Amino acid sequence: NIVLGFDNFDAYVGNSPKYGASIGPVAGRIAGASFDLDGQTYHLEANNGTNCNHSGSTGWDSALFSVESVTDQEITLYTERADGTGGFPGNLKIWVTYSLTEAGELEISYRVETDQDTLVNPTNHSYFNLSGNFTQPINDHVFQINHQGLYPIHPDGVPLHTVDRESPIVQHLYQAMLLEDLFKDSDPQIRLVEGLDHPFALPEGHENAGFFYHQPSGRFLTFKSEAPALVVYSANFVDETVHLQGKPMVQHNGLALEFQTVPDAIHSDQAEKVILRAGQVFTSKTSYHAIAKK
């Protein structure tokens, strides 16, 4: 298994690292735990300092989805979300589909409908550790991303609204970088969070957003998405109450690849990308492909 997870269902309740979780309606931080939409101010749960992160304690990751359909190749899960939940407007209908393609890819697709103008910016929060040993950090993995720049973050984790295309760490990640070297790097953004917790801008219509490689096992993961950004989180925060494979969680034990629009977009010139109007339908698809190199 190369995706971090628990051995039993109960462990997923109150799952603070959000292993494998579907995050929504809005992934990432919303500055000030509030936003304005159509002339009205909406106040959200401040669960990350003064900010709202991953839609607060009532986000989709706390919901139990029902199985709407299942075949040999895919499963579609469904849930509904009442107007005002977590402070967000709109009655939502939410479908998440997990599919296996003929090419051997895993696809995750989202479909969301609303009866009021609202915010929608979901993601999947799975962590990858290609060694399969979740008690060890991913220092011996190589990571590469075909990005158009990194969004630096403030000390509270909210991204700036400009991208950095020039710093050495940004250039290294475009070429490919051993994560042990990244975790030791003196770049102020890396030191701020002891790793990565940063959005990267992705080229529109890309065929390959990057790769994750574990040379000792030969396991090689590629990924792509219709989303315009990828938040990369390297499990910097340690919750010692979380146990995996019989041992307490260690820092940097996995890499979360969170495809979405850049967090806090509602407070930027990308606001329209996260506003879903009444009667409209939001869709997004992300694909992962794992192989073993000889």
Identify what each model region corresponds to.
Residues N1-K294:
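An exposed, glycine/acidic-rich loop-and-rim segment of catalytic or binding clefts
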